[in-house]
From Swiss-Prot:
This is DNA-directed RNA polymerase subunit omega. Belongs to the RNA polymerase subunit omega family. The RNAP catalytic core consists of 2 alpha, 1 beta, 1 beta' and 1 omega subunit. When a sigma factor is associated with the core the holoenzyme is formed, which can initiate transcription. The gene is rpoZ. It comes from Aromatoleum aromaticum (strain DSM 19018 / LMG 30748 / EbN1) (Azoarcus sp. (strain EbN1)). Keywords: DNA-directed RNA polymerase, Nucleotidyltransferase, Transcription, Transferase.
């Protein structure tokens, strides 16, 4: 399992407040059933928030998630 740091995510979304909102919205989408956009191993038992941060750090999700609204 790769470690995700806030610094990795801040490279994609420089504003901490927007990063928090984007991660929260995306985590809610994943919780409701949206498919994660990053590769997950079967042994990974990451929470939706960690998956959302992985997606942001990988550049798969950005501020556009805020424009889509909640799921």
């Amino acid at each position: 399992m790769a470690r995700i740091t806030i610094e990795d995510c801040l490279k994609r979304i420089p504003n901490r407040f927007q990063l928090t909102l984007a991660a929260t919205y995306r985590a809610r989408q994943i919780t409701i059933g949206s498919t994660p956009q990053v590769e997950l191993e079967k042994s990974d038992k990451d929470k939706p928030t960690v998956i959302a941060l992985r997606e942001i750090a990988a550049g798969k999700v950005g501020l556009e998630v805020l424009n889509r609204g909640q799921a």
